[in-house]
Amino acid sequence: MTQTSSPLRVGVGGPVGSGKTALLEVLCKKMRNHFEIAVVTNDIYTKEDQRILTEAGALAAERIVGVETGGCPHTAIREDASMNLAAVEALSEKFGNLDVVFVESGGDNLSATFSPELADMTIYVIDVAEGEKIPRKGGPGITKSDLLVINKIDLAPYVGARLDVMESDTNRMRPEKPWTFANLKAGQGVDTIIDFIVTHGMLTPKA
């Protein structure tokens, strides 16, 4: 769609290794033919996630910007989001018709949240390998994100996690809020996530 207003800003958070970068890769590859997309990644002292996404061919390199946050990565997405806001603005100016900018947080914990200034919508990724108790631990990422993604469900038998318990706990911690199981490596759950972004972000695919 041709857009004169600001792009939809989607914050993607979750603990280290949960699958944030993997999610961004599959979202970009499946959505890029229908929407104008860019990505901002956050790492403490490197631009590793930017490199991973670029080498994976998720988007053209100029559409992926890496922010080196230094110190605490939570601050860059919450208390002082200026570096990320500047990156989003620079991308918006460079590509005047952006529909979506994904902002990936640095590795964080269950208490990390995005500033409303920075993210219009938030997706939080956790994974089964952390154990079935993760949903019931709560925290803003679990309870307040717009969409919760429970990734790596294929590992459940190997780590002794019961998906029915995780489902029950998630429904209890997120009454009326959407969530989905996923195996991003195999593409499972990706269409559900895209449908959520498109519907709730009120995006119109280009012809």
Swiss-Prot record:
CDD domains assigned: UreG
Keywords assigned: Chaperone, Cytoplasm, GTP-binding, Nickel insertion, Nucleotide-binding
Subcellular location: Cytoplasm
HAMAP family for the chain: UreG (MF_01389)
Family named by the database record: Belongs to the SIMIBI class G3E GTPase family. UreG subfamily.
Top-level taxon of the source organism: Bacteria
GO CC terms: cytoplasm
Name of the protein this chain belongs to: Urease accessory protein UreG
